[in-house]
Design a protein with these regions (language model features):
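Accessory alpha-helical/coil subdomains and C-terminal extensions
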Residues: 1-67, 145-146
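C-terminal non-catalytic interaction/assembly regions of soluble proteins
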Residues: 50, 63-146
Length: 146
């Protein structure tokens, strides 16, 4: 709470951050290409295909509600994944969680859920994680912790 330009903290942050993180940007020479695809009514797979062709290492799918993926997008995302692209489900709505295996069978697809991170923050965490060689299991752990 801020009262007369003075911060009073009542709760410590639960998630890891800043100096408590496992990332050291001094050891990262370059960040991998990670892009965001925003879902909407009548979404087409062309954006996913173009991002894969341009060298994306991961795609953050910004779905509606609980990170929903339209039926017509499942196959293109799986095809991207078959080419080595990591798929992370996030939500474009401002509040709430993307629950693992609720809207999509994430375990079956080996997709990662961003949990409480919006697509833009999920992109940054994914870039840092992939720069360190994280696989999908490690990346999922990071989304639970950060």
């Amino acid at each position: 709470m801020v009262v007369e330009r003075h911060n009073d903290w009542f709760r410590a942050p639960v998630k890891r951050h800043t100096t408590a993180s496992e990332f050291n940007i001094d050891n990262i020479a370059a960040l991998p290409q990670v892009d965001i695809v925003y879902s909407h009514g009548n979404v087409q797979p062309t954006a996913v295909q173009a991002l894969v062709a341009s060298g994306a290492k991961a795609i953050i799918h910004a779905g509606t509600g609980n990170g929903s993926v339209a039926d017509r997008m499942v196959k293109p995302l799986q095809e991207a994944q078959a080419k080595g692209v990591v798929i992370v489900r996030s939500s474009r709505v401002p509040y709430g969680f993307v629950l693992r295996n609720a809207e999509q069978p994430d375990d079956k697809y080996d997709w990662v859920v961003a949990h409480d991170m919006r697509p833009e923050k999920a992109r940054i965490l994914t870039m840092l994680a992939l720069a360190q060689g994280a696989d999908t299991k490690t990346l999922q752990r990071m989304f639970w912790e950060y």
